[in-house]
């Protein structure tokens, strides 16, 4: 759900436009509830309690939160988890927790912003400023937990900043064999720099970590909000620990049961559809240098993007021209929320009419967590690749080609960037944990699933599928043009539905549909 941070920094772009390992240690508990581990070998981990302290002395947390963690509402803690759940005595890692508390005695609400690879710690300031309502935060402490391998929780490392720049700027490999080889080389780089976390940053382990976090927070049940990829972690948790499910909201739902190439197919179609809305709106407003029907504008955009392969555009950084890969990344990033479409129109107009790729490069960098000095604030790029490669199982060549043909047929503009996902998994040098599966969560308390009708990254029908899989799933349909629904600007229908459920346990009425405000 990186669009939250993108929205938080989009004001800067608007200004630009106007100008042109250890063992677990006992800590002081918030609660004294005795919590039993699911197996005796894990009891020491479950006996931990989060020892909250001021964050100001933690330079890493301060950097990740742009200094906000020094404010009195923020507190920090660490929780120790086993590196391998199959062998809990074989080393440990630490998870970074940061909470935002406005009310004394409030319950903890754990959230995951998405990804995989998205840092909850890094996103916490923007989440409490723009996403969670004051009403919700009056009843809950908002707890950010970076999953294993991500952000400040034993981050997996693969590439240097310079190598990441090169990787992001390069056009995707064209053939199956090239994809496999590129994946193999990247995987070997991860194994060289992070031999343990390159093997143990899978979602199954991250989900089990969540239960130790629950215990460390002194809670019999976990209250949780997951956005995008965070819905997958939440669904896995509910299926594995149904009796520990408290109030669960899964917004922008992934279907946990489908293979990687089907995920790619859904996203290719979702972005292709939202791009059509964006082109039509930009044309009507006279904001883009494209003319004609939607299909004609898509063709013109595709032709222009192709020219960037041989002739990338100059930018404000003389050493970093705008390539096709970077331009596509920027445009897609701005499709996550229709409130950022104006920036996409301006960036495209600057690039096509003025031969200047500066705006689109800045957007692509913001989305990738690249800082002005050339470093990357988080390891989101590395973590995204590693986690997906560990989570998914590759399809055989025949099945993979079937999906590729469908993607190219149904998403002619963007489809090329979404095909042959299984080839990347197959080339990865670490065996997949194959964590994707159908979930039931038998016996769990009600789980609220939210799907937005024109969500480009997590299509609405995935929310329908997840709701059907979960025995206690309850679907809230939201009509809108963005990725995930809940935020302060979502309108009362959405925020009241979610807040009432989280605070009082009252589910929205069966079949309820909300409408996001039009931008």
Identify the residue ranges that each predicted region occupies.
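Classical Sec-dependent N-terminal signal peptides that target proteins to the secretory pathway
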Residues: 11-13
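Alpha/beta-hydrolase-fold enzymes
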Residues: 284-386
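C-terminal motif of bacterial Sec signal peptides marking the signal peptidase cleavage site
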Residues: 15-19
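Gly/Pro-rich cap/lid or specificity-loop segments adjacent to the active site
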Residues: 29-326, 386-519
């Amino acid at each position: 759900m990186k669009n939250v941070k993108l929205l938080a920094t989009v004001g800067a772009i608007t200004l630009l436009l106007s100008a042109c390992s250890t063992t677990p240690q006992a800590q002081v508990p918030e609660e004294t509830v005795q919590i039993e581990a699911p197996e005796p070998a894990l009891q020491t981990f479950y006996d931990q309690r989060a020892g909250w302290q001021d964050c100001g002395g933690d330079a890493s947390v301060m950097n990740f939160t742009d200094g906000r963690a020094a404010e009195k509402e923020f507190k920090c803690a660490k929780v120790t988890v086993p590196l391998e759940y199959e062998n809990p005595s074989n080393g440990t890692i630490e998870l970074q927790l940061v909470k935002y508390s406005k009310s004394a005695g409030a319950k903890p609400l754990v959230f995951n912003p998405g990804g995989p690879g998205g840092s909850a710690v890094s996103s916490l300031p923007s989440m409490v400023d723009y996403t969670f309502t004051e009403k919700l935060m009056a009843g809950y402490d908002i707890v950010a937990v970076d999953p294993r391998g991500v952000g400040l929780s034993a981050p997996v490392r693969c590439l240097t900043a310079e190598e990441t720049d090169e990787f992001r700027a390069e056009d995707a490999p064209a053939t199956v064999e090239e994809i496999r080889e590129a994946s193999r080389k990247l995987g070997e780089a991860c194994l060289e720099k992070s031999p343990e976390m390159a093997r143990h940053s899978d979602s199954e382990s991250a989900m089990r970590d969540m239960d130790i976090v629950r215990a460390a927070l002194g809670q019999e049940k976990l209250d949780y909000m997951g956005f995008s990829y965070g819905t997958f972690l939440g669904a896995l948790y509910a299926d594995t620990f149904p009796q520990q499910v408290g109030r669960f909201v899964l917004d922008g739902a992934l279907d946990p049961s489908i293979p990687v190439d089907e995920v790619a197919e859904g996203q290719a179609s979702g972005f292709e559809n939202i791009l059509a809305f964006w082109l039509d709106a930009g044309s009507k407003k006279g904001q883009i240098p494209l003319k004609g029907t939607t299909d004609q504008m898509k063709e013109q955009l595709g032709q222009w993007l192709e020219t960037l392969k041989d002739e990338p555009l100059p930018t404000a950084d003389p050493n970093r021209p705008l390539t096709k890969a970077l331009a596509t990344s920027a445009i897609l990033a701005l499709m996550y929320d229709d409130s950022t479409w104006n920036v996409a129109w301006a960036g495209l107009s600057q690039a096509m009419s003025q031969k200047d790729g500066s705006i689109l490069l800045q957007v692509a960098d913001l989305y990738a967590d690249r800082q002005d000095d050339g470093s990357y604030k988080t390891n989101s790029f590395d973590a995204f690749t590693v986690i997906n490669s560990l989570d998914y199982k590759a399809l055989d060549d025949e099945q993979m080609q079937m999906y590729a043909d469908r993607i190219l047929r149904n998403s002619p503009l963007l489809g090329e960037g979404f095909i042959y996902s299984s080839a990347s998994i197959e080339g990865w040098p670490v065996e997949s944990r194959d964590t994707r599966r159908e979930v039931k969560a038998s016996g769990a308390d009600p789980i609220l699933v939210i799907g937005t009708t024109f969500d480009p990254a997590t299509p609405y029908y995935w929310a329908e599928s997840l709701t059907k899989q979960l025995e206690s799933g309850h679907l809230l349909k939201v009509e809108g043009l963005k990725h995930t629904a809940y935020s302060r600007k979502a309108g009362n229908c959405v925020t009241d539905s979610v807040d009432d459920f989280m605070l009082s346990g009252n589910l929205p009425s069966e079949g309820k549909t909300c409408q996001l405000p039009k931008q």
